[in-house]
Amino acid sequence: MSGSLAFHIIMSVTFMVFFFGGLCEARGVNVDLINDIGPNVQLGLHCKSKNKDLGSQSLVSDQHWGFRASLGFWTVTLFFCHFEWENQSKWFDIFVEDRDLTCGDHCVWSIRPSGPCRLTGREKCFPWNNKY
């Protein structure tokens, strides 16, 4: 293999890695959760995806917490959260790429006793997921 051909192959591979890698990381949605369970009710939550555990959080009434969901180039992004307050334990798929792309780059959720309500994009309230 000539030096010139090897150089062009290396440059092409480098370009593709940076170009496609940059596209994958650049695409994302900020997901913001608001504790609207009720006055003086603390909301515990734990969100994760297949590959990323965001850890446990605790929100006082009306407090916000958020994360950035990177959109996959080859896969569909899904984040789910487990919520606890008083004697309740619920879970919900908080970001589903196909469902939530109407949010644009910022998806805001109001977490309520009856279920999460998406406030951006097409506003809609959802029931909690089944237990299993």
Swiss-Prot record:
The keyword Lipoprotein is annotated on this UniProt entry: no
Keyword Signal: yes
A GO BP entry: rejection of self pollen
Secretion signal span: 1-26
InterPro entries named in the record: Self-incomp_S1
GO CC annotations on file: extracellular region
Subcellular compartments: Secreted
Glycosylated position list: 87
Keywords: Glycoprotein, Secreted, Self-incompatibility, Signal
Family that this chain belongs to: Belongs to the plant self-incompatibility (S1) protein family.
Identification of the protein by name: S-protein homolog 19
Organism name: Arabidopsis thaliana (Mouse-ear cress)
Primary gene name: SPH19
